[in-house]
């Protein structure tokens, strides 16, 4: 601030001195004309000086006003209530005075003219023998001294932008003129500068009081009239500070700027925005986005919300559903939610059978809403003792369940599944959204891509396996999804389970008897997922439609069969067998058989020596758990091929292995391809109609042995056996007992394997506990 005041005072002194010189020249010219009539001897000298004085006067009049004069006249600072103009400045500074001789010289061009003015004025004063030259007082000397000091150390105002304010004209209604590209002038004057000008003018007026009173009065009157005219012409009120940059708000405005900033934030940002993340089936996401993104763009424009969708092959871990993030006000979020719910109803998903354990009724995907919330928000939705989630169920009429909390630190979200009618689901979503609004941490998980998440993740269907294995995007599927497809179409080893994974599908042609009643509804859904998989792989829309149309014709007449052939199982996709419910031993058996008959893949017969075959299978199964002998003992009655190939039943008679991908049959020796059904013929939809189910009671105190840490044991049992394993909810027991009900669904062989693995887990846990009892006794 001191530097600003210093520059302002120096500039004011410069202007005053210039004005003094102009007024003094006029007075001296008048005195010269009077002296010409009174004293004739001095007339030649006056004639010599008169042209020079007139030249100096003309030069001063033609000089441009200074930067300070223009700014002080045209623009009023934001926080100053006074105005200034060149005329008013002249009127304040008007007055006669005499100057002493100046011996200082100027280094700048702009200052040299003013010095010459002062020196010439001094000469004229000496020649005219004016009595007023003796009345120079200390105040005027101080003003001259300030001007000389300014010459010695010139300051450039352009290098002192400490408090620069952008000014923009006001319109008639008082609002700033927001014309793009308009350049606004800059004001460097302030109230302090105006005060400095006034004080300097007062000092100059006191210094020049004396014999020039009449001329001073005339000058003051003229200057004051010109000042009033200039102020009338300039509409100073039409300018208002629009923005101010300085070293801090406290320098310029204080509370006033703070209020304006708050108002601007309210205008620009509007209502507070919130975030809701939901899961959308892949088959319905295209309808939400629209052709070229037109639908989603129109939705965002109409609602004012932002809708962000994950990429076509980027699914939420453990599912085949894309992630949709909605950002906006609560009203906009609910409008978008209703739109998405309608699109899901128009595009039914393959996972259309999810069992509600409370009502024991099957629910379709179009009656579900899946919401992802952070762990903190999930806790608020559950409420103390489950009070709020119970309230949601009662008031909305929808079934609501939250997935288990994941242990993986990379995934801090839980999935809320809402099942019911559209209106009921909307009411439930509103209640959930109210908790999202209350939670300050609800906006911590705003990502839509989960490509970097690995390990077990929360299952979207909490009634089944609590965790699902995460694979790459096109192969992502939950255990619940696999089991649902298997039970719907005919088991875990079904074409539906095969097709969901997108890759590794063998399409076989059924040349046997026609299928009397092909399941066209299932075929349509399978073909829809083939279409999604092909689009994700980069196929064009034309190619995809042609391929799906051809497959639909084959499926219509029951000619199309889907399954896994030996050639594909031989390492073509390492994780495919697990997803299809094919056990590790089945893959090892198929791999050994394929290696032995590699030269006869498309031939009718391939000779395999069972001794060599048994040795290959035994070596392949040595590293796996459970061992081959244990599984043989559990499933010997269901799988004669594995029984023949076991180490306990060697045979020297070669057995033919038909590896024909078209399902042709042939017999050689004592064994037929009918005994090798899993490897000799790809199943058709007509072959996948049988399923079975079995309930096993497990004590409540030991049910954790089946679940395992983070549910991994249950996932392992399902993958190894190929069966679907469901455990009753906590608190639901078999009648009259404290035993939880474990339901095993699948093919008979898969059920037997799963039951054996469950019993093995229970025995291991009981043995472990029995060993801990003596140790506890000894310690005590």
UniProtKB/Swiss-Prot annotation:
SUPFAM superfamilies hit by this protein: Eukaryotic type KH-domain (KH-domain type I)
PANTHER family per the UniProt record, alphabetical: KH DOMAIN CONTAINING RNA BINDING PROTEIN
Bilayer-crossing regions: none
Biased composition regions of type Low complexity, renumbered to the chain: 79-91, 99-113, 176-190
GO BP of this protein: mRNA splicing, via spliceosome; positive regulation of RNA splicing; regulation of alternative mRNA splicing, via spliceosome
GO CC annotation: cytoplasm; cytosol; nucleus
Gene3D superfamilies: K Homology domain, type 1 (3.30.1370.10)
Domain notes: The KH domain consists of approximately 70 amino acids and includes a conserved hydrophobic core, an invariant Gly-X-X-Gly motif, and an additional variable segment. The third KH domain (KH3) binds a hairpin RNA loop containing the 5'-UCAY-3' motif on targeted molecules. RNA binding by KH3 requires residues C-terminal to the KH domain.
Expressed in which tissues: Expressed in the central nervous system in mushroom body neurons (at protein level).
Lineage of producing organism: Eukaryota, Metazoa, Ecdysozoa, Arthropoda, Hexapoda
Protein name: RNA-binding protein Pasilla
